[in-house]
């Protein structure tokens, strides 16, 4: 199962029932535009701490832009905290589900 597949499962089973509609929509935006875009095709059992760390560092430095475009600012601390927390919640549940 890829991270993208698990994220879609997690959103439907856990997030949708535990979050307000606006929060659920915001999570969907962050997943779609940041997390799935870069990490989604990695199988859960192959996802490493280094890959997640590199992803977070890239987002912090370059935002949604390519590293070749340094003129664009990175994401703000508030957005980075949301991305980190959301990915952590999802992966923590994957561990509880016995998938990692």
Regions from the PLM with identified roles:
Residues 8-21, 32-100:
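N-terminal core-binding DNA-recognition domain of tyrosine recombinases/integrases
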């Amino acid at each position: 199962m890829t991270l993208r597949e698990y994220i879609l499962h997690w959103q439907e089973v856990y997030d949708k029932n535990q979050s307000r509609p606006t929060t659920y929509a915001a999570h969907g935006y962050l997943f779609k535009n940041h997390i799935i875009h870069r990490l989604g095709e990695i199988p859960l059992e192959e996802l490493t701490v280094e890959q997640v760390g590199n992803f977070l560092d890239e987002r912090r430095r370059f935002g949604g832009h390519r590293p070749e475009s340094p003129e664009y600012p990175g994401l703000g601390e508030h957005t980075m905290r949301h991305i980190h927390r959301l990915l952590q919640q999802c992966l923590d549940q994957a561990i509880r589900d016995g998938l990692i």
